[in-house]
Regions:
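Solvent-exposed, well-ordered loop and adjacent helix/strand elements within mature globular domains
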Residues: 20, 24-60
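Amphipathic alpha-helical interaction elements
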Residues: 30, 71-74
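Internal, well-ordered alpha-helical scaffold/interface segments
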Residues: 43, 60, 74, 84-87
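Hydrophobic alpha-helical transmembrane segments
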Residues: 55-67, 82
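Hydrophobic, membrane-inserted alpha-helices
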Residues: 63-71, 95-96
Length: 176
């Protein structure tokens, strides 16, 4: 197989984004990379209005770590993309939306670009240098992208609906 510029382009998008998302999950799950681990993440989730903060923090960490791994490997790409969209939409709405767009002010720029990239990846597919392609189960196209977006936004809406509605917080600048 001859590796093309397109193969390399999608690989260069997938791997760093997936690994960085795994890192965010590891911060929540294990306290690695300067993260707070389950205790501090649970406290943050409670401050953001989520019930059972520790459990919700573990779910967010697992979502980020698992989706990040899937994105990096190009495995179960539409499902991995949906998981990334779910976690990043929750982060954008619960922790960043009130701070505006730009990341330097704690805004939702970073989760927005990751979620949009995930939707784009679901449309484009993970490319030939992926687990999906190696297993012959690559799923891509507009229908798969829209399905990932719908599943991701639906999952986010379900989790966001659990939050306490009258909670006002002063969350850390980089909680997710």
């Amino acid at each position: 197989m001859k590796v093309t510029a397109e193969d390399m382009g999608v690989l260069l998008l997938r791997v760093p984004a997936g690994l960085l998302l795994m890192g965010h999950g590891a911060q929540k799950l294990f306290g690695w990379f300067g993260g707070g681990g389950p205790e501090a993440t649970g406290e943050m989730m409670t401050a953001l209005g989520y019930p059972q903060g520790r459990l919700m923090g573990l779910a967010a960490g697992l979502g980020e770590f698992g989706s990040g791994a899937g994105i990096a490997l190009g495995a179960a790409t539409p499902l991995s993309s949906a998981g990334l969209i779910t976690t990043m939409t929750n982060a954008a709405v619960s922790a960043h939306l009130s701070k505006g767009l730009w990341a330097q002010h704690g805004g939702f720029e970073y989760p927005l670009i990751l979620a949009t990239g995930a939707a784009s990846l679901a449309v484009h597919g993970p490319g030939r240098l992926s687990v999906d392609a190696m297993l012959g189960c690559e799923r891509k196209g507009l229908a798969w992208g829209l399905a990932a977006l719908a599943l991701g936004l639906g999952g986010a809406a379900a989790v966001l609906a659990l939050r306490h509605r009258n909670t006002t917080t002063t969350s850390p600048a980089e909680p997710w």
